[in-house]
């Protein structure tokens, strides 16, 4: 269900809550969806997590709508400028709002979003590249005072996902969200 369809989304959330679900993540793919988050959050029987991709302004909209948890993939939000220098404005603005709202953040890194310099260093989205990316992004948040962080590392390779999370657990005390990306059978 598209999150834009508030009625259908709330029906799904209600069914999940009736069956014991305690928290629901909803996709926030665009501004149109972002404009409906206040209504969705207000009517939801359980806390919601805003799943943000590509545009940090969607995360700001979610926080303004009362969401207290975000899932972001900084590799998709942070971009380099023409001089190949990282533009930190998105993370600066977002961190300030996260702190003001006392929100938590799940930093999600996956094999499709590993930064070019790490791909060059490791040759492919290896477990080491995934972990270095995740630690880089948690550091961006920590440097700005954000500490309510959990980390998710996923690869289309189950073995790489396991290796990356084992390596991550040796390097940080942040909670780890375990999951599989690109789940399901091929069509």
Where do the model's predicted regions map?
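N-terminal active-site wall of soluble small-molecule enzyme domains
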Residues: 8-16, 24-65
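Hydrophobic or amphipathic alpha-helical targeting/insertion segments
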Residues: 46, 54-104
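N-terminal small/glycine-rich loop or linker at the start of catalytic domains
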Residues: 1, 35-43, 103-123
């Amino acid at each position: 269900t598209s999150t834009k369809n508030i009625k259908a989304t709330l029906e799904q959330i209600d069914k999940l809550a009736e069956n014991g679900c305690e928290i629901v993540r909803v996709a926030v793919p665009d501004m149109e969806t972002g404009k409906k988050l206040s209504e969705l959050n207000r009517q939801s029987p359980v806390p919601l997590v805003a799943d943000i991709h590509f545009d940090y302004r969607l995360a700001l909209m979610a926080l303004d709508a009362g969401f207290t948890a975000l899932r972001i993939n900084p590799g998709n939000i942070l971009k380099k400028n023409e001089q190949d220098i990282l533009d930190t404005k998105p993370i600066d603005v977002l961190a300030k709002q996260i702190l003001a709202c006392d929100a938590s953040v799940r930093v999600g890194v996956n094999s499709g979003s590993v930064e070019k310099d790490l791909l060059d260093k490791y040759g492919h989205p290896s477990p080491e590249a995934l972990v270095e990316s995740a630690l880089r992004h948690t550091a961006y948040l920590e440097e700005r005072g954000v500490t309510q962080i959990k980390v998710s590392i996923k690869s289309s390779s189950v073995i790489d996902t396991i290796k990356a999370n084992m390596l991550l657990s040796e390097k940080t005390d942040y909670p780890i969200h375990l999951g599989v990306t690109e789940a399901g059978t091929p069509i």
